[in-house]
Amino acid sequence: MKKLCFRVSAALLSLGLLCCSAAAQTWSSTATQAIGPALANAIDQGALPDSTPVHVNVALQIQNRSALVTYVQNITNPANPLYGQELQPSDFVNQYAPSSAQVQSVVSYLSSQGFQNVATEPNNLMIAADGTAASVRQAFNTQLESYQLNGMSAYANLSPAQVPSTMGGIVAAVLGLNNAGVMSTPTVSVPNFPAAYRPMNFWTAYDAGGTPAGSKTAIAIFAEGDVSGVISDLRLAEQNNGLPQVPVKVIQVGLASPDTSGADEWDLDTQYSSGMAQNVSTLYIYATTSLTDADVALMFNHFAAQKLAKAGSASFGICEVFPFLDGSMLADDNSFLEAAAQGQTVFASSGDTGSSCAIAVGVNGVPGGGAPMVEYPASSTYVMGVGGTTLVTNSDGSYDQEVTWYAGGGGLSQFDLSGFWQTPVNTFSTVGKGVPDVAMDADPNSGVYLWLDGTEQCCYGGTSLSSPLSLGVWARLESAHKNKLGFAGPALYNGATGIPSPASPTGFHDIIVGGNGLYTALPGYDLTTGLGTFDIAKLNGAIHSPK
């Protein structure tokens, strides 16, 4: 799993739930709080020069959010007359997005403050603009400060971002006011291991049986940088594994970047999502400029606003306190809620540091070293967080057993709520979302062969593997049900109704051995592997779709 890693002060972790008040009555607060003062071990270099270019993404509020939440509940309930009546993007804009007048008021304000290239997303939930440190200070009543952070140059806002009170109910957050999240690229691999798998091995291990390939379903991968080599690797994997060549479309989000440091991550995503599915109608690769919160938020918003794919996978994350404080959590949660109402699902890696949250660069796959906190976006209510197991198969390739992978992320969200579908089985909290929702093979010691830079290598794993595997399973299920399953949360939890009775046929292997630090595997839902791992054929028979 690719992580956004950074060092934060104790104040950042302990004060995460606090909201900051407006500096003056003429201003209204947004969800973007002060980041600069909370950065530990950062050397203040003074104010960011006024002329420094700054790109911002201004996130807007969903209107009538409670009604939209209720709508999602209705369309995922087989007993409700609205069951299966998912929204189209135009329906969302007409019923739940900010009005054209509200959007124009923000656009006009940004232009009046010197911002250029002001562009509104089709769903009216985000406005991108280019400005300077000076225009940021004037428009959002906050100073950008320069820092030396872990040997790198960074900047962050010294105070909460605010907007004029006339836009207080319109603007949710101002993203792009910091770049303090530092990307680490640890390789989740071990030396050659005899139990390594290829995509088709998982069809047998996880009992695809007669469940059809995902050939009728479009899926998406969330990536960063130049993915041309990733597509070349995918073609080699398909050719050498005897798989069909899936149609690939790259959607550039923001400025193109030449970065290829995440190629192993995106190779895992593409090869093992489409490989697990056996085929898909289209594989969309959303390629953003960087994995800063601001750029990722724009990418997630694209996914919802366009509704090109039924589901997607994100093999990256960040300690959830950071997106809460910089406001991107609210922006992303809005995108995920829209996606759920439109019948779309996002799967996300739960992390590779066990029950602890990585707040500094460390050795991948080793729990500890950070606060007991979960990764975002896996912790988002409307995202399916995917944990990890160690998979053991029989000599014929069939399923033998699994135990919890000790480094798989899990725990309780301090900021996002447990969804109505999870609440009945989440005995660990009456409020916070439990992570993960499901799990798949992730241990690099039971990992996979990967085509990387034109050659097949071994052995890769992490929740960067389990998330795209889950996406591939879901593509099969969607195709089997004519793409009518909608948002996966309720369907998956309803498919696990036999848990915790081992005698009851369910759609999941209930993992009851192992742990990830603070948490231990238990019968039923737990904070190590969620509901468990997929038995695809049984789950296909257990879930229902609208007629």
Question: Where do the PLM segments sit?
Answer:
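N-terminal secretory signal peptides that target proteins for export/translocation
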Residues: M1-F6
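Bacterial N-terminal signal peptides
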Residues: S9-C20
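Substrate-binding/charge-relay-adjacent region of secreted/lumenal peptidase catalytic domains
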Residues: Q25-N123, A128-G388, L412-G462, S467, ...
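Short clusters of hydrophobic/aromatic residues that line enzyme substrate/ligand-binding pockets
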Residues: P377, W405, F420-W421, L450, ...
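An often Trp-containing, charged/polar helix-loop segment at the C-terminal end
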Residues: T390, V425, L471-W474, E478-L527, ...
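Short acidic, Gly/Pro-enriched loop/turn segments at secondary-structure junctions
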Residues: V392-Y399
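Acidic, glycine-rich loop-and-strand cores that form catalytic or ligand-binding grooves
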Residues: G411-Q414, S418-F420, A496-S504
